């Protein structure tokens, strides 16, 4: 009986930890993460204070923080080739990182670090030098900055069969030296690295290439981490939020279901299907059943996004900033529909897969610059600063904890729906106008469309909709309007 009780206690403790690792530890009524891809720490700190907090964002995913290899031309992917766990990159040093985390936490913006637990750098001719000046010989699996030697890695092999679990989890992903996470020593170095970030005040981690590591090894590592730092405003016994990169199209040997109990999982099917729909390759009417009926993970397990830093560079159905009208519609739907843990992308302009972030002649990352409307102008795209996107972050906050109701569609690519009696969204992806009375579910009054403008000094700078005593309002979205979406919520009532 004692053994059974002990086993049950351990089982419940493990379940409690994994459930806690699905909690993003957001402040109050905030619920959207933004990925400030390749931004400097000092710029993120300022963005938290001057833009993200006032606009109601909940957190920032930052690029990898630990020392990486220096690659010719400084492509973005060099950040994903670590050579030590020193906190020095082109985004800044440890002091600047710690300052950014503190300043963001102080205004209610949580920080989530993109971490590389699967591998170290790939092959490099001769001795490689990292962003902190550390030398390494990746071809010999020698990384003195950790230190790691060949005994800390799986034997070298290529992934040629993605249906072979051994190859997927023990061979080298695109030539990156594959760490052996079953080793006590390797585990200890990874836990030490993550715990240091927790000590500095981060709220959690995006785990790169999670499917290339055995779930039981990750479970051990996650379960060994410290609780979040209460000096940064986290409650006692709070666990780091974990979201794991697991690409699973439904026929993978290593599946997302192996990881979704350990933390949230990146729902790539969401990204692909939302892109397909808003590109016009699937009627929007079918989105009424969006979510698990589409084969997606349960809402609390799914990290959702229209695009990410990887798949925005691929061809196919995924939308990115280069199709702005469709991208804004898809993002509005993403943030309005009650499914998933939402993350929006903030990119820099690219012409090819390897384009580096905006940099000066000395290859230093440059700070974003803004025009009079607050949009970025010097190579940074900053989708999160597009009014149509940050306004929907406010919409998502306004409708939190409400259900989907009042669905309407025209049998094709015009849809609308309510979020309780707090918000209303309409979308027109047809080549003809949407013009009719629709149920907004809102209390009677005049509301500003937060897509086309804002509520300023009691007046709308864009469209407005008058809602009658029955909750109906006249909705017009022209086929040639600048935006194909309209959004109303209770915090934008005149």
Curated annotation (Swiss-Prot):
Keywords: Calcium, Carbohydrate metabolism, Chloride, Disulfide bond, Glycosidase, Hydrolase, Metal-binding, Pyrrolidone carboxylic acid, Secreted, Signal. Coiled coil: none annotated. Its cofactor is Ca(2+); chloride. Its EC number is 3.2.1.1. PANTHER family: ALPHA-AMYLASE (PTHR43447). Monomer. The gene is Amyrel. The keyword Endoplasmic reticulum does not apply. It comes from the Eukaryota. InterPro entries: A-amylase/branching_C, A-amylase_C, Alpha_amylase, Glyco_hydro_13_cat_dom, Glyco_hydro_b, Glycoside_hydrolase_SF. It comes from Drosophila punjabiensis. Binds 1 Ca(2+) ion per subunit. This is Alpha-amylase-related protein. GO terms for cellular component: extracellular region.
